[in-house]
Regions:
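Short, Lys/Arg-enriched, Gly/Pro-containing loop segments at transmembrane-helix junctions
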Residues: 152-153, 188-195
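12-transmembrane solute porter fold
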Residues: 1-147, 159-188
């Protein structure tokens, strides 16, 4: 769920900046780099923190923050102030940075050392599947809303409608990811007490 949301945000915001706000690709790219920069700063620190705090708790908090960002972007229109978009991007980067390393820590800590390569490969596969599904979902929703119309500024209202629909779907996916992390906490706590 988490990786579906991340890829969708980048592509959706790129469309929004270029076709709804009328920015060029260079300006869009400059602002889109905010989220990965925040993620790059957060992820290593979250990884260290997950050695002291239950990693699934951190992952759940990170996913909850990313869910708030997605919810903000669900209401994105042509008139949404840019600072609000930037706040959502910062929250998305912070949330995903807080989610990714602790999530990997939780996965790798839950398997015996001999199964670590399989667990790592499975996680990488799930990430790739999520990213691929996100672009498929984005294409499906845009095709549903816009039909065979091209992405162009004259169809800005349809692009906004498709973007809002995508964000609503991804908000639900993020909520499911938060609950999955919380269930994982309870399961691992129960497992640890039984050991």
């Amino acid at each position: 769920c988490s990786y579906i949301a991340v890829m969708v945000i980048t592509t959706k915001l790129n469309y929004h900046f270029q076709y709804v706000r009328g920015w060029n690709a260079q300006m869009s790219g400059l602002i889109l780099i905010i989220t990965p920069i925040i993620m790059a700063i957060m992820a290593p620190n979250a990884g260290k923190l997950s050695d002291r705090i239950h990693p699934q708790k951190l992952a759940a908090i990170g996913m909850a923050i990313a869910t708030v960002a997605m919810l903000i972007l669900t209401f994105l229109t042509r008139d949404t102030p840019l600072y609000l978009v930037v706040v959502a991007m910062i929250l998305q980067g912070f949330g995903m940075g807080l989610f990714s390393s602790p999530n990997m820590n939780a996965i790798m800590s839950s398997v015996p050392p001999k199964d670590a390569p399989t667990a790592s490969a499975s996680q990488a596969t799930m990430r790739t599947i999520g990213q691929t599904m996100s672009l498929g979902l984005l294409t499906l929703v845009f095709a549903w809303v816009m039909g065979s119309l091209e992405l162009a500024p004259q169809y800005a209202s349809m692009i906004v409608q498709a973007s809002q629909t995508i964000c609503l779907i991804c908000t639900v996916a993020c909520v499911l990811a938060v609950f999955a992390s919380l269930v994982g906490i309870r399961s691992s706590d129960k497992f640890n007490t039984e050991k």
